[in-house]
């Protein structure tokens, strides 16, 4: 009890994101703190900018969505059979939305890069997070595609998605999180 009195009251920031979507915002906030910004400056920035961090990823195996009830077992089986890869975004409320489907991993990787190309805003001056669920070789391909498109000076931070996210999406998924015009 005595120790809690020595700390100032906290402020909450709803990052409206999970995993890599939250990570990219936190990297920006940490840099602001390192640069000596006050808590009020950081909070004001967050209120304006949090909705300008987008997160998109694809799921490779629909069985995991079937297990969690996001799709029926039949849909998951059929989707896997024909190679459907849903593209998922974290929406303005911080919830996952399926925003499209492609067939095959190659098209899924291209779709992620296309979202960055279409929605990215000043991405070279902000952190860029590339995450995967036990798929470093796929993340390497996306990183190469991004560097070809945006140059080697793109500040890409690589990470593995946490086990909780991985248990819902399964292995072999890749996601991108970046500063965007909108989510």
Task: List where the protein language model places each region.
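Mixed-charge interfacial surface used for oligomerization/domain docking
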Residues: 1-11, 17-183
